[in-house]
Amino acid sequence: FTEIKNRLIETSEPIQSLRRKIISMGRVSAYNAFHNIKKAYPEPDESKWKEIPQTIESEHPYRDNTDQLFTLHQAGAKFMRVRFEKLEFESDNDFLTVETKEGDIVSFYTGTSHPSGATSDYIVGDTAVVHLVTDHSVTRYGFKVGHIEVID
């Protein structure tokens, strides 16, 4: 059983949005498992991240019934992540996601217990989308992005 389990994990197809959610970091592939095809997930080198000033922010406090997209782009970036100066939302009802331009969620935030300087998970590519969704009651500060981090 252990051998089969390990083979399924090692030969899964990498999926960015599953990277920190499941042990295989992707979708099981019977074809890959049968042929023992192992796919490497592109992990960026921590020492290569560069800070680029880019400021975007919600209204403070944000409004009720908001569904707002903010796009961050850095031409030529291979990897990108978002660094927040502040994050504060109504728990469970209002939230913010960081997504790829295709809409895959890489980070999710709700509530008020986020440290100053929180950083999203990375995105493979040069574009990140910050998506703010709020309900009809209770508002908080919202968010402020101070800069992005990229690897060229």
List each language-model region with its residue ranges.
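Domain-level representation of secreted and single-pass membrane ectodomains enriched
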Residues: 42-152
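C-terminal subdomain of the subtilisin-like protease fold in secreted/lumenal serine endopeptidases
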Residues: 1-48
